[in-house]
């Protein structure tokens, strides 16, 4: 099965949460395949239960599965890495510090892995302390260009800029988008995106 998302014009792919296999299939068909369907690891008590259920999504959507944390929960990082090793999905959501483990366990470079960084209130700077322990420590604020380079070092594919809260951090988002373009890196704006602000964000 294909391990990379099906981008529209090689540029854009939606990532939406699916609440059932049937819903995932409907979303996949509505988006003409230009979508990955998020299923949250946090919703499962065990790896085995998650793997069994997520395999159903893989079959229904031709592997357009996005293994999710659950509202960016850093405590799900290790579980996401373990699930991804078995499932080999098209897309993996990770906190910044979980990217390297996920890439190593996947054993291939096709799956897209994002690394979660947060807005700081300062244009051009992001917080990469989003892991299980680091998220409880003082912020790790670095230039967006440095965050991108670190993610590349770890085998990451994209920046997950979360939580955007819609257009609240628009100027910061523009700087992140510019840096991603200049450094040939994917960008995943996340948080508070709706039909009203979708076009402006894209």
What are these regions (language model features)?
Residues 4, 59-60, 125-128, 154-157, ...:
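A short alpha-helix capping/helix-coil boundary motif
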Residues 72-166:
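Conserved anion-binding
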Residues 43-49, 74-76, 166-169:
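Acidic-and-aromatic substrate-binding clefts and catalytic sites of carbohydrate-active enzymes
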Residues 149-202:
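Conserved binding-pocket/active-site segment within a compact domain
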Residues 21-25, 52, 78, 145, ...:
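Residue-level marker for well-ordered alpha-helical positions
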Residues 25-34, 49-64, 79-88, 103-112, ...:
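Acidic (Asp/Glu)-rich catalytic clusters
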Residues 10-18, 33-42, 63-71, 90-94, ...:
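Hydrophobic faces of well-ordered beta-strands that scaffold small-molecule active sites
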Residues 1-30, 51-53:
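N-terminal amphipathic alpha-helix/helix-capping segment at the start of soluble metabolic enzymes
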């Amino acid at each position: 099965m294909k391990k990379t998302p099906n981008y529209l014009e090689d540029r854009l792919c939606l990532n939406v949460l699916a609440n059932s296999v049937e819903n995932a299939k409907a979303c996949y068909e509505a988006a003409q395949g230009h979508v990955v369907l998020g299923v949250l690891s946090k919703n499962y008590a065990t790896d085995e239960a998650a793997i069994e259920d997520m395999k159903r999504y893989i079959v229904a959507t031709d592997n357009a599965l996005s293994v999710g944390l659950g509202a960016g929960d850093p405590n799900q990082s290790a579980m996401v890495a373990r699930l991804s090793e078995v499932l080999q999905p098209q897309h993996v959501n990770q906190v910044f510090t979980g990217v390297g483990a996920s890439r190593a366990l996947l054993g291939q470079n096709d799956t897209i892995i994002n690394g979660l960084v947060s807005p700081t209130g300062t244009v051009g700077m992001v917080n990469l302390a989003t892991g299980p322990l680091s998220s409880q420590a003082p912020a790790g604020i670095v230039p967006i260009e440095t965050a991108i380079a670190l993610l590349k070092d770890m085998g990451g594919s994209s920046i997950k800029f979360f939580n955007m809260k819609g257009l609240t951090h628009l100027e910061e988002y523009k700087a992140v988008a510019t840096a991603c373009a200049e450094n040939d890196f994917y960008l995943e704006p996340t948080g508070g995106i709706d039909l009203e602000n979708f076009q402006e964000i894209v």
